[in-house]
Amino acid sequence: MGTLGFVLGTAAMDHQQVLIDQLVDQVKNTPADDTFYYLVPNHIKFETEINVLAGLRDRQGLSGSDRFASSRVQVLSFSRLAWYLLRDTPAFQKQHLSKIGMAMLTSQVVQEQASDLRLYASEVKQPGFIQKMTAQLEELKNANITADDLTDIIYRVKSANDPAANQAWLAKMYDVETIYHAYEARLRDRYIGNSELYRQLVSYLQKSPEVAKMHFFIDRFAQFTANEQQVVDALITNAASTTISLTLDRGYPDQNHPNPQELPPKNNLFYSSAMQFHRLWKFGQMHQKEVKVLQNVAFATTPRVDAELQQVDSYFKRYASEPIGPGEREELLDPQNIQFMTTTNRMTELNNVATQIRQLVASGKYRYRDFLILSRHLDGYQTMIEPVFAAHNIPVFNDHERLMDNHPLVTLLTTLLELPQRGYRTADIIQLLKTWLLVPRTGTGDLMGLSDFQAAVFTTENWCLKQAIEGKNAWTTNDPEKIKQLWQAPGTNLTDPKYEQSRLEKLNDQLALVKDFVANHLLPVFDQFKQAQTGQELATALYQFLAAMGVTDRLYAWQQYQSTRDLDLARQPQQVWTTFCQILQEYVEILGQQELRDGTNEVLADFSELLQAGFAAAQYSQIPATLDQVVVSETGIVQSENRKVVFMIGSTDDVMPEMQESDSLLTDQDKDILSAYLDEDFQYLPGTAIDQLIDEPFVHYTGFMNAKEQLIFSAPQSDSDDKELSISPYMHDMARYFGQPVREYPLATSKAGQDNAIDFVSAPLATINRLVEVSRQIRDEQGVGIDRQPVMPVGWQTVAESLVKLAKQWQQSADAKVQAEGISLGQRLSLVAAGFHYQNKIDSLGNKLAQALYLRAAPDDERGRVLYASISQLQDFYINQYEYFLKYGLRLQKRDELTLSNDRIGTFFHKAMETFVTTIRENNLSFADLAHKDNQMQRDQLIDHALVTAQENQPTLLRLINSSAQAQFQYQQLTAIVKTMLITLCRQAEYTGSQPVKTEVQFGRIGNQQPGNLGSLDYPLKDNHHIYLRGRIDRIDNLKQGNNNFLTVVDYKSSNHLFDLTSAYYGLSLQLLTYLNGLQANLTELETNNPRLAGALYLRLNNPTIKAAELKKSSLDDLKLKEHQYKGILLNDPQLLRELDKSLDKQAFLYPLKEYKNGKIKANKEALLVTPQQLDWLQNMNKELVINAGNQILSGDLKLNPYRLLTGSNRRTGLDYSDFLDVFQFDNMLDQQNYRDLNPNLAKEAFDNVVQDDDEEDKK
């Protein structure tokens, strides 16, 4: 008969000491062939083994330096116990299915059962569904609920007409039951999972005679799963002795509390442990033939923690069970050992913790392994932990799980297998190459140099975007003409002697390298995939492809590279490859002999899903790189008990305590219904959110009590998104009870931080970071410019001097490593010092270099050299002078992509409009006549002709349209807009006397084209230079009135544009006025009698959306007309305006004007009516802007001076749409003085002054 004993005590007591004492006693007093097993959670197995063996050694009188081992004692987890006892049994020889294999098996089952599912049929393809379903199935197995049990429960629920179980619940349970039955059928007799493993262990414990000689000590388990509970029950009834340690202040019952009916209330801190104890005690009483329950419970009475932690232990036990009055106080023996603080944010919090750890270790009283940092959840800190602790030069081990699903090998596999289904998109092929795991081989068979291949891939990526290369055929073509068209740079002449060693040759070689690699080495693998008949053949083809392509060589190279830098990163390639091999092995085991269905794309998609499911379940193994390091973990994870100091970070009220939300497929309500039909002694599901909330105090309590000497609470005041956070009630109430302040840890830049530099001294790098922050703050406070030094606080001045001194000491060290660190520190200090004097200023080019850069010779002109410029270039100059230099001096360009960009759309629009207007004029047709229904067929033919001509004008457009469905849709929208606009043009002619007379009128030379229809705008500059301004007017309309011909300029826009006086005044919008000046300078060339300028207008090209409610007021055609009004500048001549829009007396269709009953015509904000004098003033202003820009450009004195215009709540700057922000390095905090602030009122005042001057002139 075996025995069942308990060791109880709070977390402040040393349970392990009692267990080891009992272990030593039993080892001495039992036969030599008896064996002993010390069972703990897997997370702490290694450290517990060290502690237990050390305890055994000490009790045998051996010193710490003596070697010690004990073959009779094993420290194991439950899973390792199963392996240890079953490793030679037939059951254990079955294929062991890992989490990855389970996920793959679930994925396969779900795919097969998808058509039979009621609720989940639409979710089977959703990301994460397979993981959730796998977890749910395993949860049911761990709860000892079989598929047959589930079927029986569903039947009983239906029979009982349980009102809680509605149709949705039944549908969900039907789906789970369907999948579960298929899942169990696949597992049965072939595989062994964790649940089956535990069942086999229970069977072994019940049948093997060897178990009667085994003694078990179970420690540090707060609760057992149903499977673990079965194992414990089997140990109790079959082993020689079982001793269980629980964190519990008393037994239910025990020698001091004999009433077996007495149970604690749910608000008792140890409620879960008490219920666990009572269940085990009750089980022992029910099996008195097999086991004797020891009468007296052993209590751990030796404190494991210091006195202050014992005070916390007593306080929290009471705090969880009953309210403590706000006036109650208890004084800590040493307040330094229990601290409470808040910080500004999580980053400041981590830096504070790291600084304290660094300083405590520097005191010589602590090692890094003495510190444990805990948080309820580490998600908010995950990206900060490594860089912060690296800056403080603190070794850290983050045991938070890390998934493999973002590793380049995973990206390679998923992208490769999805290529056919996604149509061999170029973006996917480039992504595949950018994993850098697939590299071409040289003629010798070696992998080519990675840097050369990377350069070729980047070049090819840009080229493919520029040429809109898409699809398998584009990559695999052998047609010389297609290769020349798609894969050779324009101007390539292989027979030209100058071609060799040229940039063209290098470009073509890079393109050929990547194209050939993809066509001849990557894509052929899909032919091998097509030939695969079974799952095993498919897996073999994939493995052989990766091996042949040198993927293993690349992974090994990565491992070798990181082995001397970061051991954690160095282990990842091997772990990922091992995981991949395991996935393939389990895939072959599960699906290897299954014949693949027809349809390679679908087969590969399914295969990819299985691989992704496998990798999504895989994690990197967490192996500490060194024993002496700080551990970062989460509460709820069992920790070893040898940490002296615990930092509880993130102590905020949203997670301490936390109301957890279940993300499993079965909700808490689902589980509540299910639990009502379970055998509570044999089957039980994990606790619901309410159960977990009851356990929250205990979870945090065990976290607090990991500390032996100090417990430090820390809480950020705000989250990463600046959301305000409040401190935890646990932290607040404990601080109040012990009369301790919740100290706000100051920023280094605050007054307190400036006065106490010592609080921020850590490793050199982290200290420098704080020193920089303080120095900047002091400079701002003292108003110190870059040419002066601020007066630093004494403490920080000492810190700065100490860092310089330290750098010099290290540089003089005989140790080469220390010397290198000294040089690095010195360089960083020099860089920091220089940074305070850095200005984001642009050096002047000087006029000679500027003139050499910008000036060109003018043909047949001896007046000097000429600055050729376009309107958009000068607008860029006024937006930001430095951007002009980058674009037109250095000729920097953003990556060219063959897309339906604004430029290409504009070209298409203009060509279509030009063709339409020109054809009508050449055939002496009337725009107004074409608006009539009788001429609709002729008009449609003209529109089709215009569209064809516009498309032929851009040969690459057809290739772009055929490259993707998105481009096809965009083109359809584009042609619809053009059709709408051409019809609108005809309808507008019915309401105006103005007619288009010219389109696409070019003045000056554009690029390499022939000189335009009209001459350049030629303005003289300083030093006998000239600026030739070029442009293209979209349309010129003519209104004949008496002997005069009034000309208006029309500029097409794809978005809504208004003439903005302020933008025109400051040079931000030069187009309309420059067009007028260009037209005026060439009036004699127009062959028009008595030409006069009537205005300049924008016309928006769009297909407007008309609200249904508006159709009640006007017809659709009229509403469309009003949506296409001309907006801009017009002469304020009533007779002219009435001719321009003959509908003014009713409702203006063509212009944003309104004629009142008194005959006056006024414009709304979308048009500006001007007098001839005002128009002259605007044109002269425009001319001066052009001349000033030209002189400034040639002076070479260009500035980084983006404009800034504030109008009400609107803010516009010259940086809003720039492609060169990374080049500018413009800092909105430090470079405010570089903005060129514009006065929004100045232009209006100047414009109004023209009116006043005219009035005064009239009076004279």
Swiss-Prot record:
This protein's encoding gene: rexB
Pfam families for the chain: ADDB_N, PDDEXK_1
Cofactors (names): Mg(2+)
UniProt keyword list: ATP-binding, DNA damage, DNA repair, DNA-binding, Exonuclease, Helicase, Hydrolase, Nuclease, Nucleotide-binding
HAMAP family: AddB_type2
Organism per entry: Limosilactobacillus reuteri (strain DSM 20016)
Gene Ontology terms for molecular function: 5'-3' exonuclease activity; ATP binding; double-stranded DNA binding; helicase activity; hydrolase activity, acting on acid anhydrides
GO terms under biological process: double-strand break repair via homologous recombination
Classification lineage: Bacteria, Bacillati, Bacillota, Bacilli, Lactobacillales
Oligomeric form and interacting partners: Heterodimer of AddA and RexB.
Descriptive protein name: ATP-dependent helicase/deoxyribonuclease subunit B
Enzyme Commission (EC) number: 3.1.-.-
InterPro entries in UniProt: ADDB_N, DNA_helicase_suRexB, P-loop_NTPase, PDDEXK-like_dom_sf, PDDEXK_AddAB-type
The organism's place on the tree of life at top rank: Bacteria
Disulfide bond residue pairs: none
PANTHER family in the cross-refs: RECBCD ENZYME SUBUNIT RECC (PTHR30591:SF1)
Family classification: Belongs to the helicase family. AddB/RexB type 2 subfamily.
Function: The heterodimer acts as both an ATP-dependent DNA helicase and an ATP-dependent, dual-direction single-stranded exonuclease. Recognizes the chi site generating a DNA molecule suitable for the initiation of homologous recombination. This subunit has 5' -> 3' nuclease activity but not helicase activity.
Note: Despite having helicase-like domains, this subunit does not have helicase activity.
